[in-house]
Structures are given as structure tokens and as C-alpha cells.
Amino acid sequence: MTHQHPYHLVDQSPWPLTGAISALMMTSGLILWFHINSTILFILGTVLLVLTIINWWRDIIREATFQGFHTLSVSNGLRYGMILFITSEVCLFFAFFWAFFHSSLAPTIELGVSWPPTGITPINPFLVPLLNTAVLLSSGVTVTWAHHSILSGNRVEAIQSLTLTVFLGVYFTILQAWEYFDSPFTIADSVYGSTFFVATGFHGLHVLIGTAFLAVCLLRLYNFHFSNHHHFGFEAASWYWHFVDVVWLFLYICIYWWGS
């Protein structure tokens, strides 16, 4: 009886607190990992974060699908929230590109007054990075196919296309990890290595998050949680995935191709 209104008034929840604690544990764990080579706190923070995400998303799915709390007004509010979240992510990556161009457009004498810096062998942009570009752009096509299938009520094609999208996301992550292990330079190799691994690493983290987001949507699709007029969870995931696609295009053009 407490929800006989169209507004988004959330119930008391422990998950923001556990999420904040997990973030503190992970950042503190990273510091310990860097300085004393101990990964225990980082792993515990990661486990707590995963448990928080599982339980928080479970509660949201329960509210949206089974309790009917996600009215039109609530859905519109969630849309605005997702748009603002993606905008904040744009600002995050803008900072990485700023750092890259600040260093590359006017390389200092310590770098040999050249870009890439003297002694750095860049990754060939027409090998694994080009394949990764094709993989990620293909996943953008398949997630759009899934969206249109949901809108038209074609559940079978929606499941097929979303499964393919998740597979392409996992494949991209494997290729990126392979590229890192095979890289001729490290994050410690001047500002070139720092900007390269921070920018592409954060993008890879976003691909992992987006893949998890889409995998949850696939599970919900199997369980008949989406209809052609009520599927904002999938819409939010697809927006996020398209954002990841666009960021990769800028990374490929600026850092891999022009930066090499």
C-alpha cells in the first residue's frame, strides 16, 4: 500500500553502503597490491562488489517486473538518470583523451621530441586493434537487431541476437587481453604507456560491465521479463553498449592509428 502513486520513492536498501565499502576495499587493495604485492583486500572488495551488484539488480528486477513499481514516470526518471550517467562517462574519457593529446601534440625533450617516444614500438593498428574494431562494431549491429526483435515481439530472434552480442563482447575482451600480454611496451614506459593502458584499460573495464549488463538482460529475456512496451533494462544496456562502441572508435583512430 506504500506505492499507490507514480513516483520513484526507493525503499531502504543496504546495497549503496556495501557498494561504497567495496569501492573503498578495492582502491585500498590496489594500493596494497602496488606497494606490498598483497591482493587479498582487492579480491575481497571485488567479491563484495559482485555480491552487491547481484543483490541490487535482483531488487530492481523484482520492483520492475513483479511488483509493478516502474510506472511511466519512474521509467522516464530512470531514462534521464541513464543519460546523465553516460554523460559523466563521456567526461571521464574526455580527460583521458586530453592527457593523450596534451602529451602527443607537443612531446617534451624527455620523450625525444617525438611521438611515439624514442624507444617505444607502437602496436600495429591494422592487426588485433582492427579486428577488435570489427568485433565491437558487429556487436553494435547485433544489439540493435535484438532491440528491434523485442519491439516486434520476436523473442527467438531477440535471444539469438543478444546471445551473439554477449559472445562478441567476451571475444573482444579476450583479444584485448591477448594484445596486452603481447604488447612491446608496458604502463611504466613513459607517458605513452601510461595514457595507452589507462585509456584502453578503462574502456576494457566498461566492455566487461556492458557484457555483464547484456548477459543479465539475456537471462531476463529467457525468463519472459521483457515485453515490446516494457524493456527499459535492455534499452539502458544497449545505450551503454553503443557508448562503448563510439569510445572505441575514438580510441582506435586517435591512439592506435594516429598515435602510432
From Swiss-Prot:
GO terms for cellular component: mitochondrial inner membrane. It is found in: Mitochondrion inner membrane. SUPFAM superfamilies: Cytochrome c oxidase subunit III-like. Keywords: Membrane, Mitochondrion, Mitochondrion inner membrane, Translocase, Transmembrane, Transmembrane helix. It is a multi-pass membrane protein. The chain crosses the membrane at residues 30-50, 81-101, 126-146, 158-178, 196-216, 239-259. Gene3D superfamilies: 1.10.287.70, Cytochrome c oxidase, subunit III, four-helix bundle. GO terms for biological process: mitochondrial electron transport, cytochrome c to oxygen. Its main location: mitochondrion. It catalyses: 4 Fe(II)-[cytochrome c] + O2 + 8 H(+)(in) = 4 Fe(III)-[cytochrome c] + 2 H2O + 4 H(+)(out). It is an enzyme of class 7 (translocase). It holds the Pfam family COX3. Component of the cytochrome c oxidase (complex IV, CIV), a multisubunit enzyme composed of a catalytic core of 3 subunits and several supernumerary subunits. The complex exists as a monomer or a dimer and forms supercomplexes (SCs) in the inner mitochondrial membrane with ubiquinol-cytochrome c oxidoreductase (cytochrome b-c1 complex, complex III, CIII). Component of the cytochrome c oxidase, the last enzyme in the mitochondrial electron transport chain which drives oxidative phosphorylation. The respiratory chain contains 3 multisubunit complexes succinate dehydrogenase (complex II, CII), ubiquinol-cytochrome c oxidoreductase (cytochrome b-c1 complex, complex III, CIII) and cytochrome c oxidase (complex IV, CIV), that cooperate to transfer electrons derived from NADH and succinate to molecular oxygen, creating an electrochemical gradient over the inner membrane that drives transmembrane transport and the ATP synthase. Belongs to the cytochrome c oxidase subunit 3 family. This is Cytochrome c oxidase subunit 3. It comes from Pisaster ochraceus (Ochre sea star). The gene is COIII.
